[in-house]
Amino acid sequence: MTQQKMDIKNVVLAYSGGLDTSIILKWLKNEYGCRVVAFSADLGQGEELDPVREKALATGADVVYIDDLREEFVRDFVFPMFRANAIYEGHYLLGTSIARPLIAKRQMEIAAKEGCDAVSHGSTGKGNDQVRFELGYYHFNPNIKIVAPWRTWDLNSRQALIDYAKKNGIPVPVTKKRPWSSDRNLLHISFEGGILEDTWAEAPEEMYVLTTAPEKAPNKPQYVEIEFKNGNAVAVDGEKMTPAQLLAHLNYLGGQHGIGRVDLLENRSVGMKSRGVYETPGGTILREAHMAVEQITMDREVMRIRDGLIPEYARLVYAGYWFSPEREMLQALIDDSQKCVNGVARLKLYKGYCRTVGRKSDTDSLFNQDFATFEKDQVYNQADAEGFIRINSLRLRIRSMMQAAKKK
């Protein structure tokens, strides 16, 4: 055993209960001879968490934590991100990306509580999650030791993993494994790998979990009203809900109508392209509703500046920089812009589409029908438009004159 391994006595493992992290748990015990604390975060995975405690203990965990973080997840991570209207490469609502900082945060809290000198995760050396987890770890403890088995061990094939599991008494699922991997929380479920690596092949219908096929969704549209306060959704159809309850409810409504499916070939942080298929029914509805209320309450120039920051904000979340000073700076600016975002959006849900059909704000509306009408009013003199246009066209007219002069 190397000195580095001898220095590690207590490890907190981010444990999902799946075959890979079960093998990692046993591998940590075998290779390091250390105490292993297994930690699973309940972010809304549902039934996936039911067997986790028993499986972790059976595999050799000394202590098991299963923490319900659903409200914190939506309130402190999803909602701030949605106040920014963050979207990565025009399609991805960052459901996996935004979950990792919270898992890392709680994992480090457990490490401090349990006196652990190292943390471990099951992310591969080719993916984004290794970066997201470890940037979070170092934020909370710059000196923490990190064990990332996928970057060091020799179990480099699925068969090698299965052989190791059988050798160490870890149950291997006897049912045929679905030919893709998935990750689920309250915001979304993602699918990647396996048959999805053929970028031309359509994702099979049996893959989808949260959403009805749009063509099989109800033939009658459903209308939903979502109320916002300071940029955060607080009620659906007049019923107040907690953040987690609200997102779960929108997931149910959106799922019924086939809303929120995305098939994307995205650029990973490490440089390669990767295909991901996502279901984000509630998040898709929430973002559309939020933008609708912004349309009636937010100043044009404030919106223009904020919109210019969305790609950078989304990149920071995607790349794992949630705890960075630059993300916090952007968040402060964005949150200041949300003080006026108070109102209600009315949306129409129908066969995969989510469309705004109305918006209102009793306290912060900047829309005045008297000003917007084509009828005469006391505020706007239409003749003033001529001077406005001539001033704004000055640079264009000068450019045209200069180009004409060059041709002479």
Swiss-Prot record:
Pfam families: Arginosuc_syn_C, Arginosuc_synth
Gene Ontology biological-process entries: argininosuccinate metabolic process; L-arginine biosynthetic process; urea cycle
Positions that bind ATP: 14-22, 41, 122
Location relative to the cell: Cytoplasm
Annotated TM spans: none
Keyword ATP-binding annotated: yes
Entry's EC annotation: 6.3.4.5
Cysteines engaged in disulfide bonds, as pairs: none
Family under the similarity heading: Belongs to the argininosuccinate synthase family. Type 1 subfamily.
The protein's name: Argininosuccinate synthase
Species name: Pelobacter propionicus (strain DSM 2379 / NBRC 103807 / OttBd1)
Gene (name only): argG
